[in-house]
Amino acid sequence: MSLLRDKMNRLRGNIREEENQPGAVVPATEEKVAQLPEDDEEWLSPVWETFDVKLVTNEIGSFLLRKIIYPSDFRHGHHALVELHEAAPALSAFHPDSLTSAEQIMFLDLETTGLGVGAGNVPFMVGIGYLSKDQFVIEQALIRHPAEERAMLHYLMGKLNDYTFLSTYNGKTFDWPLVQNRFIMNGLGQKMWEPQHLDFLHPARSIWRNTLVSCKLSHVEEERLGIHREDDVPGSLAPQLYFQFLANGDPAPLEGVFRHNEIDMLSLACLAIRFGHLLNGTIKLYIPLPDEPEEMVRTGLWLERMGKMELPDHLFDMAMKEENSKPSTLVMLAARDKKAGNWDRAVLLWQKAIIHSSNHFGSAAHEASIELAMYYEHKIKDFESALGYANAAFEHALNHSQIIRPDAKKRAELDALRNRIARLRRKSTKHVH
């Protein structure tokens, strides 16, 4: 017993130190979130109390719950949680027929026993977050064994009905389908709530797929949200730690899983703030605009897809003026201008892409050469210029085919370029005569 007591004392000491730090978690001690058992029928290990986990019961059964309350002025990385109020209405761009408010968003993140949404994958921890009375509340429900899952899901069901929007990170594909499956398997019904999804993985990939090494939440938050986790338990280890708890009954290793999930919830709120600020055009009031040309262009293209046609031009102009813009970025922006009928800038961008590829004529310069060949042939009727660009594209394609055996698509492209060159030579000769 002395060893257990020493361990508990050390845990309590660590918690007290964290609570004395700026921005410490405020435990939910005043508001009852569910009926607490009034007798001693179920004994809860004192170790749970060291990280503010309580045993709760409802008409279905029991489960564990941890509740943390953050003040609205709490800063998580670059953003304060109070910014949700200003940013949330702009998130209506995800669902133009709905009006978004910060109070109507529920944030959801699961810790599960495995991957996929099949019957063998169980969410052993469900984290939810929401605004309440200018505070950001995080609730984390945990089951100590499978028999508690139904009670946990019943509690979640009661919470969901108060919200319209569900904010996740890959939740449209993973978290929410898994929750729905668990509701059905536990006899709690189907389609009990149909959320308006705010899945922030998709805009993250749209904007950062090439400028960040990974679009995992932990990487996005560090590189773009200014959030640095210390002594974090990786999400991939959460199932292992949970199974360890099931095997020996010691809850201590799960404290790190609770903390990991808690940070995920805060980061989800900050992503809502970031994308909301981008959509309402106020982002530069809070953080500097992106300084990488590709991120500028991808951000602008995403804003256009979200219906914010008036916002991207400044980003596009900045990207075009950057001397270090990659040829692929210039070609991407040129494709947008071509579609919009802005031929003058499209031509300038294609030409700039080729100039920037002078040391290495890569795929972007190849694409730019083909586009310029088509432009000068069909729009300007300058067959000599068109022939020059077509020859450059053919030479690149031919050299590439000698290094890597071409597939059917590449062979068809070579044949198309041969035909284009032959046609341009005929047109050029006729034009001279």
Where are the regions a protein language model picked out?
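Residue at a conserved register position within TPR or TPR-like alpha-solenoid repeats
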Residues: L303, L333, D337-A340, Y376-E377, ...
